[in-house]
């Protein structure tokens, strides 16, 4: 994942059953959202409105300006020009803030991501023994909860990766697995991308992923996405065709969206891909990466403390919270196909101008 903060059964021969609408995720086209505007380059202006950053929970609207050009391919999306935080520059409350060696390590890994060119193999990271121990502890602890807490699609996909506590997977290997099943690719990133760039990447079936790992002082906690979150939270779900469609629909909706719409789409991503839950046989199971990559969040989700609501993409969504402890509320999906259709309906209002 690259900004703040989450089947059909996969056959043994490497093929996947089609989505419920009869199409594999590779045939999900931009035309589904009426993207005639993608046929030629252009710059969008939304009336005379501009959205400007604000310290408040949502952006502030002010007078005329031009939105960024709409990317026509993943090549048009910068990789690292707008890193919002973390990366090698850590906040004072970060576990690794006072560890100069850790910060230098993060900086080196971030530099590799910044230099990466699309089409080239993702740089391999030679993880240290300490980093490998962190990965092993996280994988071992989370694997204890997955059978009872994770959705069935996650459990079906998980074995495809052959995760081992003895080795941190490399992004290039994982990217090849995603390509094989759903046509998605991974692109390394130095830290938290601007939401517009991150969401735009999803439209082109590209997932921006960090490569650094959380600080060794607290293996079960990270204030930002790291390689453990990316691998254990996101990768198993992205080989599931219907979930991959869901993520891509959010990305397609972001192409040419105003800053205000980007903010709403960011929340939709947050409450589905990051912290989404789904009902299975009258039980709540996790499919969001922010839950699946957190031992404490998984336990909290199954406790009596949080509340659950149905997702309405058109409604005003609660403030995103990732530093105030666990989520107080989760959105509960009935199915991935149903949620995707709801998101697609919302996306049509963005691109029809309504």
Curated annotation (Swiss-Prot):
Its main location: plastid. It catalyses: (6R)-L-erythro-5,6,7,8-tetrahydrobiopterin + L-phenylalanine + O2 = (4aS,6R)-4a-hydroxy-L-erythro-5,6,7,8-tetrahydrobiopterin + L-tyrosine. It is an enzyme of class 1 (oxidoreductase). Catalyzes the hydroxylation of L-phenylalanine to L-tyrosine. Does not seem to be tetrahydropterin-dependent and shows preference for 10-formyltetrahydrofolate as cosubstrate and electron donor. Its EC number is 1.14.16.1. GO terms for biological process: L-phenylalanine catabolic process. Its cofactor is Fe(2+). PROSITE patterns: BH4_AAA_HYDROXYL_1 (PS00367), BH4_AAA_HYDROXYL_2 (PS51410). Keywords: Allosteric enzyme, Chloroplast, Iron, Metal-binding, Monooxygenase, Oxidoreductase, Phenylalanine catabolism, Plastid, Transit peptide. GO terms for molecular function: iron ion binding; phenylalanine 4-monooxygenase activity. This is Phenylalanine 4-monooxygenase, chloroplastic. It comes from the Eukaryota. InterPro entries: ArAA_hydroxylase (IPR001273), ArAA_hydroxylase_Fe/CU_BS (IPR018301), ArAA_hydroxylase_sf (IPR036951), Aro-AA_hydroxylase_C_sf (IPR036329), Aromatic-AA_hydroxylase_C (IPR019774). GO terms for cellular component: chloroplast. Forms monomers. Pfam families: Biopterin_H. Fe cation binds at residues 229, 234, 274.
């Amino acid at each position: 994942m690259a900004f703040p903060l989450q089947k059909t059964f996969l056959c043994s021969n490497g093929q996947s059953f089609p989505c419920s609408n009869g199409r594999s995720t590779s045939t999900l086209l931009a035309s589904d959202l009426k993207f005639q505007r993608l046929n030629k380059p252009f710059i969008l202006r939304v009336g005379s409105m501009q959205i400007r950053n604000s310290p408040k929970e949502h952006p502030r609207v002010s007078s005329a300006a031009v939105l960024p050009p709409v990317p026509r391919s993943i090549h048009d999306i910068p990789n690292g020009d707008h890193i919002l935080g973390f990366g090698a520059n850590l906040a004072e409350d970060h576990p690794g803030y006072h560890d100069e060696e850790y910060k230098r390590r993060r900086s080196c890994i971030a530099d590799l991501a910044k230099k990466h060119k699309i089409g080239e193999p993702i740089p391999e990271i030679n993880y240290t023994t300490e980093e490998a121990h962190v990965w092993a502890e996280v994988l071992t602890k989370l694997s204890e909860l997955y059978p009872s807490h994770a959705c069935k699609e996650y459990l079906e996909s998980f074995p495809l990766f052959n995760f081992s506590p003895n080795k941190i997977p490399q992004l290039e290997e994982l990217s090849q697995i995603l390509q094989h099943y759903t046509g998605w690719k991974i692109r390394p990133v130095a830290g938290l991308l601007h939401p517009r760039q991150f969401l735009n990447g999803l439209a082109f079936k590209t997932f921006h992923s960090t490569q650094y790992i959380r600080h060794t002082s607290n293996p079960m906690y990270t204030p930002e996405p790291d390689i453990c979150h990316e691998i254990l939270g996101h990768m198993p779900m992205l080989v599931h065709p219907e979930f991959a469609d869901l993520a891509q629909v959010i990305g397609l909706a972001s192409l040419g969206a105003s800053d205000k719409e980007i903010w709403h789409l960011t929340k939709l991503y947050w409450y589905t891909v990051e912290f989404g839950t789904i009902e299975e046989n009258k039980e709540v199971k996790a499919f969001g990466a922010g839950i699946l990559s957190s031992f404490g969040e998984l336990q909290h989700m199954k406790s009596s403390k949080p509340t659950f609501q149905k997702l309405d993409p058109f409604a005003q969504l609660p403030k995103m919270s990732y530093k105030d402890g666990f989520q107080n509320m989760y959105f509960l999906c009935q199915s991935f196909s149903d949620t995707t259709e709801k998101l697609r309906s919302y996306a049509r209002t963005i691109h029809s101008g309504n």
